[in-house]
Curated annotation (Swiss-Prot):
A single BP term in Gene Ontology: 1-deoxy-D-xylulose 5-phosphate biosynthetic process
Cofactor details (free text): Binds 1 Mg(2+) ion per subunit.
Protein name per UniProt: 1-deoxy-D-xylulose-5-phosphate synthase
Broadest EC class assigned to this enzyme: transferase
Gene name of the record: dxs
Annotated keywords: Isoprene biosynthesis, Magnesium, Metal-binding, Thiamine biosynthesis, Thiamine pyrophosphate, Transferase
Length: 641
């Protein structure tokens, strides 16, 4: 610990039970110390930052008022849960966040009983919370379920589906809307806090319930008008609550999420209520309590290691452009020649490179929010009118729009262009964000063109290829992070559809790569050459349509054929095996194996370590070749020593 973050009261807290023994004035001090500890920890590890600082008081209040983990506390997405982890027995490991063997950057059921539901993706908390609340009622228990969801996450359709269901069931669910963007622009202050306490209190709820019961015995027209008048009066005084009231929630707020004098009595009132569901609208500030993060919330949403005194982040020197920037720049160049090109993102403009496109073509850029399903069908609609939509979405988030890809795009052969970022393993964000499955879930669909960029130069050409494909949907996948530092083309040149390329020619072993594992395949070929095994290295470029001619030639001309991909079982390697089987090539002498990600959800680590563990680095490729040949790589190497 540094002088900056001495935490005498926090040092006495091992579990929330310790927190609940303190006086209210001490709770305020705990919150201050918790903020200092969060700042200090993230300065060491990096990670999501601004959102966690914004919920320090809320986190402290929730654990003080509710009996966690008996009361279930669910954090939507989970990236704001670092303060929660510190208060729930994980402080001693908080400086292992997002490192191999360390704490997850999100909530995780296997990590603590205080994480009743794991997360990573958005907008799941209310559905999960409702399930827990109903389970509690069915079991005859009376514990509270609290779902904390941000104003960005609550915009997704799944959240509204859950609220609609919860309101109709009158379940004892508590939803806390963490509004840190002021998107609803509510009044915040003493009067709002007073009214929130009033409306969360027993007297108001009892009167309201009595009114509902009386309304059941009134003529329908009068009852409807009375209910409408009550909703309008609440909307006039409180602002922002009418929608949630229509969904069947008791709306409480807006409340200053940094004022414990306001938060604690409201949470206590709601805790002691006999009815539900409740929605408490809490207004917070991202980066609260740390000047640089308050001044630039976007830059401090997620950080690398940084200097606490200055806020300067220790970013490594770049040796090559990032794939997302190459995509964005390539799309701009193509759009300068074609006014039908438009860019679409689902709340990730900077993460996908669409922000680069937006600066050049703001009117042709569409950020639809956390709404991947809508993004895909919106793109499909644009395609029907002759536009060329590029839908840039992370591989892991594209999973959320699978039915739209099938039903709205592929069946109709609409030329939507998918730019699939974060393909393969993503390191510190772990299993919830890994792009492991798109090869498999897209490869089984008719009418798709599927490409993977082996390096940043290939990505430029593949963007140009997508522009030229106007009779069916297409997808190009590429990983997180920097490219290889290869020479970049001035302009993209459309590739021949369904044709791969041979990088180097050999005659004993063939390594057929799909994606950026090509670099490791080349390293493996160098090693195999020193061991006397002449090795061909090929870049498939396309998974669909597959270069059948290339695949058959590699199988005929080599004793061993390995496919290598940054994807799960059922992807590129499976397509190659299917092709070989159909041509009778697996009946002969070729020894074929598919190197894929292991059939597990891999925990977070740095990408190099993860790919080594997955058996997809050069060393593992060499070992696999010798395993197939029935030899030991270490023995063969020692013979040459």
């Amino acid at each position: 610990m540094t002088e900056f973050s001495k935490t005498p009261l926090l040092d006495t807290i091992r579990t929330p039970e310790d927190l609940r023994k303190l006086r209210i004035d001490q709770v305020r001090q705990v919150a201050d110390e918790l903020r200092l500890e969060t700042i200090d920890a993230v300065s060491v590890t990096g990670g999501h930052f601004g959102a966690g600082l914004g919920v320090v008081e809320l986190t402290t209040a929730l654990h003080y008022v509710f009996d966690t983990p008996r009361d279930r506390l669910i954090w939507d997405v989970g990236h704001q849960a670092y303060p929660h982890k510190i208060l729930t027995g994980r402080r001693d490991r908080i400086r292992t966040l997002r490192t191999g063997g360390g704490l997850s950057g999100f909530t995780k059921r296997t990590e603590s009983d205080h994480d009743p539901f794991g997360a990573g993706h958005s907008s799941t908390s209310i559905s999960a919370g409702l399930g827990m609340a109903v389970a509690s009622e069915l079991a005859g228990k009376k514990n509270n379920v609290i779902a904390v969801i941000g104003d960005g996450s609550i915009s997704a359709g799944m959240a509204y589906e859950a609220m609609n269901n919860a309101g109709a069931m009158n379940s004892r669910l508590i939803v806390i809307l963490n509004d840190n963007n002021m998107s609803i622009a509510p009044p915040v202050g003493a009067m709002s806090a007073y009214l929130s306490r009033l409306y969360s209190g027993k007297t108001y709820r009892s009167l309201r319930e009595a009114g509902k019961q009386i309304g059941k015995h009134l003529p329908k027209l009068i009852a409807d008008r009375a209910a409408r008048a009550e909703e309008y009066s609440r909307g006039f005084m409180m602002g922002g609550g009418t929608l949630f009231e229509e969904l069947g929630f008791y709306y409480v707020g807006p409340v200053d999420g940094h004022n414990l004098d306001h938060l604690l009595p409201i949470l206590q009132n709601v805790r002691d209520a006999d009815t539900g569901p409740f929605l408490i609208h809490v207004v917070t500030q991202k980066g609260k309590g740390y000047g640089p993060a308050e001044a630039a919330a976007d830059k401090y949403h997620a950080v690398v290691k940084f200097d606490i005194a200055t806020g300067a982040q220790a970013k490594a020197k770049s040796n090559a452009p990032s794939y997302q920037n190459v995509f964005g720049q390539s799309l701009v160049k193509e759009a300068q020649k074609d006014d039908k090109i438009v860019g679409i993102t689902a709340a990730m403009p900077s993460g996908t490179g669409i922000d680069i496109f937006e600066k050049a073509f703001p009117k042709r850029t569409f950020d639809v929010g956390i709404a991947e399903q809508h993004a895909v069908t919106f793109a499909a609609g644009l395609a029907t009118e002759g536009y060329k939509p590029f839908c840039a979405i992370y591989s892991t988030f594209l999973q959320r729009a699978y039915d739209q890809i099938v039903h709205d795009v592929a069946i109709q052969k609409l030329p939507v262009r998918f730019a699939i970022d974060r393909a393969g393993l993503v390191g510190a964000d772990g299993a919830t964000h890994a792009g492991s499955f798109d090869n498999a879930y897209l490869g089984c669909l008719p009418n798709m063109v599927i490409m993977a960029a082996a390096d940043e130069a290939e990505l430029v050409h593949m963007v140009a290829t997508q522009v030229a494909i106007d009779d069916r949907p297409s997808a190009v996948r590429y990983p997180r992070g920097e490219g290889r530092g290869v020479e970049m083309p001035e302009v993209g040149i459309p590739l021949e559809i369904g044709k791969g390329r041979v990088i180097r020619q050999g005659n004993k072993v063939a390594l057929l790569s799909f994606g950026t594992r090509l670099a490791e395949a080349e390293k493996a070929a160098d090693e195999l050459a020193t061991l006397g095994l002449s090795t061909t290295v090929a870049d498939a470029r396309f998974m669909k349509p597959l270069d059948v001619e290339l695949v058959l030639k590699l199988a005929r001309d080599h004793e061993v054929l390995l496919t290598i991909e940054e994807g799960s079982i059922g992807g590129f390697g499976s397509h190659v095996m299917q092709t070989l089987a159909e041509h009778g090539m697996l009946d002969g002498e070729v020894k074929m194996r598919a190197l894929v990600l292991p059939d597990v959800f891999m925990d977070h680590d740095n990408p190099v370590a993860m790919y080594a563990r997955a058996g997809l680095d050069a060393k593992a490729i060499v070992k696999k070749v010798f395993d197939v040949l029935g030899k030991d790589a270490a023995t063969e190497t020692s013979k040459l020593a």
